[in-house]
């Protein structure tokens, strides 16, 4: 996935009100970025470190700049725009870069499914084969070289696991795909200490036949590419 134009860089001052971040530009002036991440961004916020942002030409936007990448204290890049996760997953599947999800000829987004008024991130179809329901999760919480999910208690994430189990029970393929947007993450696990209910439900889902995949990104100021398989460990978080 290429950005419409190379990202611009700045230095982070602070993030506040969840959706805003103040930064210092290269010319020394300050501006406010839109922060497209509603999570805690635990271990992703490093005041004084570099960030990268895209710029919209939409005159109706209050904040023209969108925060895309951050840098941690070890120089790792972090993709903080959670909306990119679904885009990356769809592109990678369409290009055949996720081997476990090859062989489907149709990809649909945001299709209603399940018993709890949900919409699936991606629904794959191929002839007479069972449909494949995919929930996509962005993983950026780093603990040593582990990526943990979620970074806060997630009742929504718990609901999605229940929905995936129901789809599997009905005979479909059900997949949880972690899109790892942090260069320092080399293994993924549920965040047991943060959301033990989610961790337990995830193990229950695996036992019920839900598949779990994790893939990492190549990233720079020109774009992102999801193509690096990462091991998942259901009991290690």
UniProtKB/Swiss-Prot annotation:
InterPro entries for this protein: SfsA, SfsA_C, SfsA_N
Matching Gene3D superfamilies: 2.40.50.580, 3.40.1350.60
GO MF assignments: DNA binding
Listed PANTHER family: SUGAR FERMENTATION STIMULATION PROTEIN A
Family to which this protein belongs: Belongs to the SfsA family.
Identification of the protein by name: Sugar fermentation stimulation protein homolog
Organism encoding this protein: Shewanella amazonensis (strain ATCC BAA-1098 / SB2B)
């Amino acid at each position: 996935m290429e950005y419409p134009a190379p990202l611009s860089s700045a230095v982070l001052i602070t993030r506040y009100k969840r959706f805003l971040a103040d930064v210092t530009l290269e010319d020394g002036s300050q501006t406010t970025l839109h922060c497209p991440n509603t999570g805690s961004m635990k271990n992703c916020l490093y005041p004084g470190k570099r960030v990268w942002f895209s710029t919209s030409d939409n005159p109706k936007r209050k904040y023209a700049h969108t925060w895309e990448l951050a840098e941690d204290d070890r120089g790792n890049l972090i993709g903080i725009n959670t909306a990119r996760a679904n885009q990356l997953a769809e592109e990678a599947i369409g290009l055949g870069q996720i081997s476990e999800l090859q062989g489907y000829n149709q990809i649909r987004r945001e299709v209603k499914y399940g018993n709890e008024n949900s919409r699936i991130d991606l629904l794959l179809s191929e002839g007479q084969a069972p449909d494949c329901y995919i929930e996509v999760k962005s993983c950026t919480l780093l603990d040593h070289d582990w990526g943990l999910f979620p970074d806060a208690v997630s009742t929504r994430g718990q609901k999605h696991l229940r929905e995936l189990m129901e789809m599997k029970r009905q005979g479909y393929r059900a997949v949880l795909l972690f899109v790892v947007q942090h260069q320092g993450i080399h293994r993924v696990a549920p965040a047991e200490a943060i959301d033990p209910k989610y961790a337990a439900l995830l193990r229950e889902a695996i036992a019920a036949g839900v598949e779990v995949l994790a893939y990492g990104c190549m990233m720079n100021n020109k774009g992102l590419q999801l193509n690096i398989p990462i091991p998942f460990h259901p009991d290690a978080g």
